[in-house]
Amino acid sequence: MGDPRARAARTKRDRTRRALLDAADSAFGSRGWARTRVEDIAQSAGVSAATAYNHFPTKHALLAQVYAPIINPLLVQARQDIAAGRPVTEALSDQVRALCRLCARNRVLTSAFYAAASEYTIKIGALPDPGDDADPRTLVPMTEALELLIGYGQAAGELRPYPSARDLSGLLVNTVLIRNVNRPGESADITAELLLTVMFGALRPEELVGAERPFPAAR
């Protein structure tokens, strides 16, 4: 049955981790990236800053662990859509709309993630390293769901092969993140309309022929 002391230690670690994540969610979600300190999060969670850093190596990693559960369902849905053989245009349309809704619903937290990812990118000056457990871009692979679906459609010949799935998914996600910061009053539907027009304009231009606004925001 295991060592009771070891079980108690694991339980304590799990509770501490949960308390830190809850405190971080509240802090980043209300104060954003720049005005939130790990020390303040630790105090709210009832632990020392050293304990917080034992669980999360950097402020960037802590924020990423808070934000990842918001984004992970998109990747789950993309994999399910591919496994079910769902039409890729439908899957991509729903994926883009869902991404825009999630970002709008969690606007301050999304802005904090964008700030953290940008700061880390500038710091290391390189693409994400899968082995870097402090890189928010690795811990929250925001582009992966779109990249999977676009790549799937391109491999099946349903979408044009250029731009590549990686390049286009990155462009789309960066656009969402930037507009989330620069246009805080913009609705998710408006953002999604823009992204869908750009995406299908590149991958399925025939979808746009004869329509001034083929993906109206009112949908």
PLM features: what roles do these ranges have?
Residues 1-4, 101, 140-156, 162, ...:
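C-terminal peripheral helix-coil segments that are non-catalytic and often amphipathic
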Residues 13-25, 41, 66-70, 74, ...:
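Generic hydrophobic, amphipathic alpha-helix propensity
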Residues 19, 27-61, 65:
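Helix-turn-helix
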Residues 23-27, 102, 175:
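Short amphipathic alpha-helical elements of helix-turn-helix/winged-helix folds
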Residues 65, 79-106, 169:
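Hydrophobic alpha-helical connector segments
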Residues 80-81, 97-104, 115-121, 196-203:
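Helix-loop "lid/cap" segments that line or gate small-molecule binding pockets
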Residues 100-147, 181:
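Short secondary-structure transition hinges
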Residues 110-114, 122-125, 158-163, 207-212:
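Short, hydrophobic secondary-structure boundary micro-motifs
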